[in-house]
From Swiss-Prot:
Modified residues (N6-acetyllysine): K82
Name listed for the protein in its UniProt record: Ubiquitin-conjugating enzyme E2 N
Reaction catalysed by this enzyme: S-ubiquitinyl-[E1 ubiquitin-activating enzyme]-L-cysteine + [E2 ubiquitin-conjugating enzyme]-L-cysteine = [E1 ubiquitin-activating enzyme]-L-cysteine + S-ubiquitinyl-[E2 ubiquitin-conjugating enzyme]-L-cysteine
Sequence ranges assigned to domain UBC core in this UniProt record: 3-149
Oligomeric form and interacting partners: Heterodimer with UBE2V2. Interacts (UBE2V2-UBE2N heterodimer) with the E3 ligase STUB1 (via the U-box domain); the complex has a specific 'Lys-63'-linked polyubiquitination activity. Interacts with RNF8 and RNF168. Interacts with RNF11. Interacts with the E3 ligases, HLTF and SHPRH; the interactions promote the 'Lys-63'-linked polyubiquitination of PCNA upon genotoxic stress and lead to DNA repair. Interacts with ARIH2 (via RING-type 2). Interacts with OTUB1; leading to inhibit E2-conjugating activity. Interacts with RIGI and RNF135; involved in RIGI ubiquitination and activation.
Similarity-based family: Belongs to the ubiquitin-conjugating enzyme family.
Superkingdom per UniProt: Eukaryota
Function: The UBE2V1-UBE2N and UBE2V2-UBE2N heterodimers catalyze the synthesis of non-canonical 'Lys-63'-linked polyubiquitin chains. This type of polyubiquitination does not lead to protein degradation by the proteasome. Mediates transcriptional activation of target genes. Plays a role in the control of progress through the cell cycle and differentiation. Plays a role in the error-free DNA repair pathway and contributes to the survival of cells after DNA damage.
GO molecular function annotations of the record: ATP binding; ubiquitin conjugating enzyme activity; ubiquitin-protein transferase activity
Record cross-link Glycyl lysine isopeptide (Lys-Gly) (interchain with G-Cter in ISG15), residues: K92
Length: 152
């Protein structure tokens, strides 16, 4: 981890020593600014039982700029688009240098428990969530079975 800012080293050490329950985040062997992340679908959510792969990258400006995060596993969620980009305020205008990688991962995990169709990135999914939530939840469960189980 030579050449990395001390803050990134400290955050990485803490993530490895004290993992967030339901989340695994490991730095890439060749680039310590790039993390391989796996988030377990939260209990009592349509994503329960799934394991979702994400990539997290710390830009050169971190912590003055937010990490770049995206889902690698397909997910049916109003706040995640087909490319895996995530609509989450702390990844955009609400980012603060006081926040950490850990905070970002916890916020993404919370977004899985509480999709927000009123601030969508995937408009079609959000529309389905608003007009027929039961059907949207069933589709999310089906996608979880299809794409997020036995995928690790």
């Amino acid at each position: 981890m030579a050449g990395l800012p001390r803050r990134i080293i400290k955050e990485t050490q803490r993530l490895l020593a004290e993992p967030v329950p339901g989340i695994k985040a490991e730095p890439d062997e060749s680039n310590a600014r790039y993390f391989h992340v796996v988030i377990a679908g939260p209990q009592d959510s349509p994503f329960e039982g799934g394991t979702f792969k994400l990539e997290l990258f710390l830009p050169e400006e971190y912590p003055m700029a937010a990490p770049k995060v995206r889902f690698m596993t397909k997910i049916y969620h109003p706040n995640v688009d087909k490319s895996g980009r995530i609509c989450l305020d702390i990844l955009k205008d609400k980012w603060s240098p006081a926040l950490q990688i850990r905070t970002v991962l916890l916020s993404i995990q919370a977004l899985l428990s509480a999709p927000n169709p009123d601030d969508p990135l995937a408009n079609d999914v959000a529309e389905q969530w608003k007009t027929n939530e039961a059907q949207a939840i069933e589709t999310a469960r089906a996608w979880t079975r299809l794409y997020a189980m036995n995928n690790i």
